[in-house]
């Protein structure tokens, strides 16, 4: 056993030797199976080798290539007239040898139009003289096997047959009982062609072993379809005894048609001798002229070039033409690659059916170093695919949950009106939460750290109307720039957006962003101009600024409702609610089916110390009950309890009701869909599948983040090891975790790289302390607490735990910490300058008599001597004297003598620059 076998690998030529096959046979099967290889010396895995062995056991005869070749040459004359249809070869499949004839396994087809079969007499032809070579082959035992009967199973054809084809099929119905002589020659009878655009052929099924009692299938001697059918059919002349035909050259192998890879069936058809049962295909008659090779009829489905010969001429002609036809077929079908995200180099190579070395080489030429197991992001994978001639298309991603997608076809008959979902959006500190508090008569804003909202709150209120109380659902989103994802999530599930703009501040960046989110979600916008009670309020200026973003007030001829309000004074709140109900009634059609299993979206999620994972869910269709089996993204759970926005326990949540859900096995991601299932086993299976896919995507992203370009690698090698700051993030809710990670990724990381080891909702535990101690990481605790014993463990292990309540303070500290990891840089600090007025010889050297023009000169400081534009010396001030006395420094406006041990070529007019090198703290910018 070779070393490759011992390592779980085997070379192709070793496998071919074990199977008794030619290397080209095995390579052809490798290509058919999609196994990457280059030569017969390439190695494949043991699993791939088993697939090849299984294919050969189902396919090629055990005698190898030589025996198959003798059988095919001997049976060529008997099988010539039976090839009524030649199928196209599959894309990428290369036949092993020109003279091998792949046998087609098809079954007879019952015509779609039943007609009364009329038996036709078979013409009796005289015996032809057989050449010696053919006679020897006919005497071989393999030829005797070729004439044994084969059972044929009829299959109903899905192809429609028009009236013109029925006449051609009549003579083929009842001729299976007619005998055929082995010496019978090809009868080139006229036939009608089938439709060019035929649907895919049915899968071939292996034929049973020949039985002595099985009836002998007989086919009429019909030729293949002509290359150029003509409207005037004429029977082709047959060879006679006086004009013996020359021995025919074996025909090129007829390959099975290309099929999708997922379809079953044998990869290699068994190479049986004898007559092959074929499906009768009507062909259009055309005049044929017998040639020396007798292959003047173009194959059905083949693509021929203008002026191509009929098969005669130098050897290799049919092989060459077949290769041209296969190349033409390949060119016809564009190579399309579907990508849905990050992908490893090995998976990309398997999808494109190219060696992995080709992808590695392509990226190397673009200064990107990767290995076979490395993950490429989607942009890089698309670049490689286009370089290799593939057209990249994005796989249809599963759409995220929206209010319209929650409705199914079966809900139409049971739809009822549901309350509208209103999202409060706007710039930070413009009074969004205060306005909602005034509507709810609550004080949520007082509990927010720093006075800014840092997570989504969902609330339900009742509005008294003349027809009775009506419900409104409010979502309060953060206005800080770090919480972009939360605002986008709020706009995604909302029906109406209330844009809060401060009358004394006007339109700000987060106001513009909120407008963009609302327009992208396609929801109507209602503007609440807040703080109109302040002295410097200017509502008209706010309206003017909003017109720049296509929000024109109704009183100016537009369609946007703008209501001046005051959250503190509770001014015009009833008018705001009234307009919300008007927009919901006249512009929207809000319906849901409460009599079905619930579906919806997770608005927020957190880990509670006493209650476990808690998710704030918005039911968008159906009714959520206690005890329901629920799947949230990749998390399975059973609803243990439901709480409304005021903390009251409820048994069910109808559509558009926000509730807190208890009973999940883990903290879900904010924005995930949830759905209730009746079968617990099915729910667990779906959750497990999503978990596996999420884990794979997470690993791919981690691998993609470690990819290093050649330029960056060289720079890091010159400057030393790249600095890295490891972090562990813990926050109160999942949305805050997302916001922190997104904000950290925006920090410059060219000099110091951030590596987030863990990021999740929940308190800081002792496990986090152990991980931080082992990896020298810093723990960031955002609006959460430390578990019992965690603080003491952190002090003992020396782990830095930073606690924050406001996100921008966290970002400032992290940036300072990243800058602290940078080595200080040396910068030049200018001290002064002097001009050489006169040169004095002193001993063996010279001293420059100077006049200090600016700053001061210091002894032992560094100096630079300039003569014109050229620097003639750079060194230290070794001696500094004033009136023959040593001086430590000489200030501006005084004369002095300057000397250096390493420079004596002073000249009047030289300029002296005195400076020193100092260290300076580096910044990320």
From Swiss-Prot:
Molecular function (GO) terms listed? GTP binding; GTPase activity; translation initiation factor activity
| Primary residence | cytoplasm
Q: Which residues form the tr-type G domain?
A: 417-589
- Region annotated G3 sits at 476-479
Q: Give yes or no: UniProt keyword GTP-binding.
A: yes
This entry carries the following GO cellular component terms, namely:
cytoplasm; cytosol
Q: Which GO terms describe its biological process?
A: translational initiation
Q: Where is the composition biased (Pro residues)?
A: 199-209, 217-238, 279-288
Location of the region described as G5 in the Swiss-Prot/TrEMBL record: 566-568
Asked whether the UniProt record includes Transmembrane helix among its keywords, one would answer no
- Ranges for the region named G1 are 426-433
Keywords assigned by UniProt, alphabetized: Cytoplasm, GTP-binding, Initiation factor, Nucleotide-binding, Protein biosynthesis
Q: Name the residues that bind GTP.
A: 426-433, 476-480, 530-533
Ranges for the region named Disordered are 190-329
Q: Where in the cell is it found?
A: Cytoplasm
Query: So which domain of life are we looking at?
Result: Bacteria
Give the region (G4) as residue ranges. 530-533
To which protein family does this belong?
Belongs to the TRAFAC class translation factor GTPase superfamily. Classic translation factor GTPase family. IF-2 subfamily.
In terms of NCBIfam families, this protein maps to:
IF-2, small_GTP
According to its UniProt entry, what is the function of this protein? One of the essential components for the initiation of protein synthesis. Protects formylmethionyl-tRNA from spontaneous hydrolysis and promotes its binding to the 30S ribosomal subunits. Also involved in the hydrolysis of GTP during the formation of the 70S ribosomal complex.
Please state what the protein is called: Translation initiation factor IF-2
Question: Origin organism of this chain?
Answer: Gloeobacter violaceus (strain ATCC 29082 / PCC 7421)
């Amino acid at each position: 056993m070779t070393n490759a076998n011992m390592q779980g690998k085997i070379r192709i030529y070793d496998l071919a030797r074990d199977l008794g096959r030619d290397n080209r046979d095995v390579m052809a099967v490798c290509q058919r199976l999609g196994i990457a290889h280059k030569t017969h010396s390439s190695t494949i895995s043991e699993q791939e080798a088993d697939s090849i062995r299984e294919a050969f056991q189902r396919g090629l005869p055990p005698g190898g290539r030589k025996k198959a070749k003798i059988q095919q040459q001997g049976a060529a004359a008997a099988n010539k007239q039976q090839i009524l249809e030649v199928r196209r070869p599959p894309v990428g499949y290369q036949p092993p040898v020109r003279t091998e004839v792949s046998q087609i396994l098809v079954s007879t087809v019952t015509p779609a139009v039943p007609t009364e079969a009329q038996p036709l007499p078979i013409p009796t032809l005289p015996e032809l003289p057989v050449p010696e070579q053919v006679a020897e082959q006919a005497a071989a035992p393999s030829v005797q096997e070729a004439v044994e009967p084969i059972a044929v199973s009829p299959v109903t054809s899905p192809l429609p047959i028009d009236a013109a084809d029925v006449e051609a099929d009549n003579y083929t119905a009842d001729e299976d009982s007619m005998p055929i002589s082995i010496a019978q020659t090809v009868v080139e009878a006229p036939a009608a062609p089938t439709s060019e655009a035929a649907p895919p052929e049915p899968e071939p099924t292996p034929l049973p072993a020949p039985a002595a009692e099985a009836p002998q299938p007989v086919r009429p001697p019909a030729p293949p379809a002509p290359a150029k059918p003509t409207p005037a059919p004429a029977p082709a002349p047959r060879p006679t005894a006086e004009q013996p035909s020359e021995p025919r050259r074996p025909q090129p192998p007829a390959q099975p048609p290309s099929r999708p890879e997922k379809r079953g069936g044998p990869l290699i058809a068994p190479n049986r001798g004898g007559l092959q049962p074929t499906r009768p295909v009507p062909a259009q008659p055309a005049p044929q002229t017998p040639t020396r090779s007798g292959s003047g009829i173009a194959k059905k489905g083949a693509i021929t070039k203008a002026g191509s010969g009929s098969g005669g001429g130098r050897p290799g002609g049919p092989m060459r033409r077949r290769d041209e036809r296969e190349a033409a077929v390949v060119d016809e079908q564009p190579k399309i690659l579907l990508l849905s995200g990050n992908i490893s180099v090995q998976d990309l190579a398997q999808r494109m059916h190219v060696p992995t070395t080709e992808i590695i080489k392509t990226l190397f030429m673009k200064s990107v170093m990767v290995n076979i197991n490395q993950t490429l992001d989607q942009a890089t994978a698309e670049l490689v695919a286009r370089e290799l001639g593939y057209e990249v298309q994005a796989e249809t991603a599963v759409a995220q949950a929206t209010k319209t997608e929650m409705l199914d076809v079966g809900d139409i008959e049971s739809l009822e009106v549901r309350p509208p979902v209103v999202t409060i959006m706007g710039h930070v500190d413009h009074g969004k939460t205060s306005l909602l508090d005034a509507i709810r008569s609550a004080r949520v804003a007082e509990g927010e750290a720093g006075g800014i909202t840092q997570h989504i709150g969902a609330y339900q209120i009742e509005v008294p109307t003349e027809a009775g109380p009506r419900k409104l659902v409010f979502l309060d989103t953060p206005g800080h720039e770090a919480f972009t994802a939360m605002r986008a999530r709020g706009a995604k599930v909302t029906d109406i957006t209330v844009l809060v703009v401060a009358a004394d501040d006007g339109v700000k960046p987060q106001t513009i962003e909120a407008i963009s989110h609302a327009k992208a979600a396609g929801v109507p916008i209602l503007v609440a101009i807040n703080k109109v009670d302040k002295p410097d309020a200017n509502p008209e200026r706010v309206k003017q600024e909003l017109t720049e973003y296509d929000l024109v007030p109704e009183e100016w001829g537009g369609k946007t409702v703008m209501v001046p309000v005051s959250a503190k004074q509770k001014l015009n709140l009833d008018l705001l609610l009234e307009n919300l109900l008007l927009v919901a009634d006249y512009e929207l059609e809000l319906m849901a089916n409460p009599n079905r299993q619930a579906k919806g979206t997770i608005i927020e999620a957190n880990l509670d110390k006493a209650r476990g994972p808690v998710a704030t869910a918005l039911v968008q269709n159906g009714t959520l009950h206690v005890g329901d089996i629920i799947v949230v993204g990749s998390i399975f759970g059973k609803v243990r309890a439901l709480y409304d926005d005021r903390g009251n326990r409820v048994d069910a949540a109808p559509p558009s009701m926000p509730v807190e859900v208890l009973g999940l096995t883990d903290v879900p991601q904010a924005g995930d869909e949830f759905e209730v299932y009746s079968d617990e086993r099915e729910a667990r299976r779906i959750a497990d599948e999503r978990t596996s896919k999420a884990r794979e995507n997470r690993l791919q992203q981690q691998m993609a983040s470690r990819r290093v370009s050649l330029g960056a690698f060289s720079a890091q090698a010159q400057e030393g090891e790249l600095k890295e700051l490891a972090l562990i993030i813990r926050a109160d809710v999942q949305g805050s975790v997302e916001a922190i990670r997104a904000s950290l990724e925006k920090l410059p990381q060219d000099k110091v790289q951030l590596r987030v080891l863990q990021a999740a909702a929940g308190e800081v535990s002792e496990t986090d302390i152990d991980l931080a101690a082992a990896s020298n990481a810093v723990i960031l605790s955002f609006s959460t607490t430390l578990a019992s014993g965690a603080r003491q463990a952190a002090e003992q292990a020396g782990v830095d735990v930073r606690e924050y309540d406001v996100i921008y303070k966290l970002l400032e500290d992290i940036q300072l910490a990243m800058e602290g990891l940078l080595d200080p840089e040396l910068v030049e600090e200018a001290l002064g300058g002097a001009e050489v007025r006169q040169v004095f010889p002193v001993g063996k050297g010279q001293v420059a008599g100077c006049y200090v023009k600016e700053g001061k000169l210091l002894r032992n400081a560094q100096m630079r001597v300039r003569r014109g534009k050229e620097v003639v010396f750079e060194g230290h001030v070794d001696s500094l004297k004033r009136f023959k006395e040593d001086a430590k420094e000489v200030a501006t406006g005084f004369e002095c003598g300057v000397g250096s041990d390493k420079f004596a070529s002073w000249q009047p007019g030289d300029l002296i620059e005195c400076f020193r090198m100092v260290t300076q703290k580096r910044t990320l910018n």
